[in-house]
């Protein structure tokens, strides 16, 4: 098979390999089409004549319109296709009531915390409340690596530039995100590290935390001690002793929470990696578990694939408000809502934001949407959730971690080395990338494009890997020491 028609109503196919000009293209269900020009892998080719102004249809939905008449076999990309997106939309609810057939959950070897929550890692986290103490946090963690061993799997810190010179909602958002991170069950112990004169004060963090376990969450204000390294190390020693009392035990997979993310997408993302992840998400929900879909701007143009799956009108209105609120966020900054696909996305075959979005939401599978979470919000309902966060890789994976995700399934067609605080599994969309960057990869979904595995077979393989990672197998990012955060800022800097 040279190319694929994703939906029978599509007027394009996607090249599964580079197509040469004049080549007869084999695409099941389409019939014979001869390429009029070279078509790179992952890019689109028209299967029939399309008049100027008419829609390009992919995934069964319009992903833009052609700007000139095109003939069958024409390469379709940014030179002859434009977006249909503009501003806010008056969404309507037409519920489809998707049904998920229950599946008996397997178990994984995880940690059961004293409060009943479940973890896939047993680590100590040092969280700076302000960027001024990032280097203090780094030195503390470097000096505490000898504590790692037994059931204590790591000591990590998460530098960021914020926590001071912020005001209002922007400041509150930073504080809420840091506190949400501290609640993650993978952190057996947390040290909030403060300077002492910043906006994000010790007292504000305490107020945001509410009820908490003082043996698990500790505080150190650097200006209040003579030697912050000595004081900090003593706290980490105490936290480590407590963490080592926890060991792995069988946990039902129904208690897993998995984040869904893509970055560096290409034209194969919506054909290989994202549908594979979507099937894993559906399987997790069928087992009674939870998955979380984010990247709100990368839902624009594909909203109908999501909104009609909301379980009731309250969830629908929350999702619609989130989508239009994000568009208003763009407009308030005098930006268009559709200027999203990156140069790498376009090189890989993604032409418009609708094109990117329709592929992006494949990660959400077909399960009902049960809840909509604000930024820095935490999961409270089992099933498929939507989370308000931007498409930026590091900001959104940080938000997924803060929401309580035990791991993140991250699809990529271009490759990326980073890792979130939660284990981040890189799912590659194509085998060429897998051959070129094996050190960044956890799973190659490119085998779907080559015909080596079906979508369902690849999803079964990925699910087995998910259980292994939940049981302690380290991801490629973890093996390289990548544990990073990025905070969504929307305000002035004093």
Question: Where are these predicted regions, by residue range?
Answer:
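Metallocofactor- and cofactor-centric catalytic cores in central/energy metabolism, strongly enriched
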Residues: 1-407, 414-417, 422-494
């Amino acid at each position: 098979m040279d190319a694929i028609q994703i939906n029978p109503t599509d007027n394009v196919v996607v090249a599964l390999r580079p197509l040469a000009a004049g080549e007869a293209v084999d695409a099941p269900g389409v019939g014979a089409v001869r390429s009029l020009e070279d078509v790179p892998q992952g890019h689109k080719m028209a299967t029939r004549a399309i008049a100027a102004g008419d829609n390009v249809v992919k995934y069964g939905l319009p992903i833009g319109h052609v700007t000139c008449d095109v003939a069958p076999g024409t390469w379709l990309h940014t030179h002859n296709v434009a977006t249909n997106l503009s501003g806010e939309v008056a969404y309507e609810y037409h519920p489809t009531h998707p049904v998920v057939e229950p599946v008996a959950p397997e178990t994984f070897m995880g940690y059961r915390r004293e409060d009943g929550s479940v973890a896939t890692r047993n680590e100590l986290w040092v969280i700076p409340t302000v960027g001024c103490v990032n280097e203090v946090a780094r030195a503390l963690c470097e000096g505490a690596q000898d504590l790692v061993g037994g059931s204590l799997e790591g000591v990590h810190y998460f530098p960021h530039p914020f926590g001071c010179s912020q005001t209002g909602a922007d400041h509150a958002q930073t504080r809420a995100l840091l506190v949400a991170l501290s609640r993650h069950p993978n952190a057996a112990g947390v040290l909030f590290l403060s300077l002492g004169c910043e906006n994000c004060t010790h007292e504000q963090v305490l107020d945001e935390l509410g009820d908490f376990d003082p043996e698990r969450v500790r505080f150190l204000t650097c200006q209040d001690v003579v030697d912050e390294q000595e004081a900090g190390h003593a706290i980490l020693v105490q936290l480590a002793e407590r963490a080592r009392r926890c060991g792995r035990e069988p946990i039902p997979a129904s208690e897993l929470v998995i984040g869904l993310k893509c970055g560096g997408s290409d034209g194969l993302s919506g054909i290989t990696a994202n549908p594979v992840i979507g099937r894993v998400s559906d399987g997790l929900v069928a087992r009674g578990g939870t998955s979380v879909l984010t990247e709100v701007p990368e839902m624009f143009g594909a909203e109908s694939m999501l909104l009609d799956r909301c379980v009731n009108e309250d969830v629908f209105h929350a999702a619609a408000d989130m989508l239009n609120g994000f568009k208003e966020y763009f407009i308030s900054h005098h930006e268009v809502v559709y200027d999203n696909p990156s140069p790498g996305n376009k090189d890989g075959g993604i032409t418009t934001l609708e094109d990117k979005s329709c592929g992006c939401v494949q990660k959400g599978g077909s399960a009902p949407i049960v809840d909509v979470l604000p930024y820095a919000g935490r999961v409270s309902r089992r099933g498929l959730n939507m989370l308000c966060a931007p498409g930026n890789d590091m900001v959104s994976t940080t938000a997924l971690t803060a929401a309580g995700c035990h791991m993140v399934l991250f699809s990529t067609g271009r490759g990326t080395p980073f890792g979130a605080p939660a284990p981040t599994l890189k799912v590659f969309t194509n085998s060429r990338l897998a051959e070129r960057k094996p050190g960044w990869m956890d799973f190659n979904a490119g085998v779907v494009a080559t015909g080596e595995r079906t979508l369902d077979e690849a999803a079964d393989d990925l699910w087995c890997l998910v259980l292994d990672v939940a049981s302690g197998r380290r991801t490629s990012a973890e093996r390289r020491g990548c544990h990073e955060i990025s905070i969504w800022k929307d305000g002035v800097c004093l």
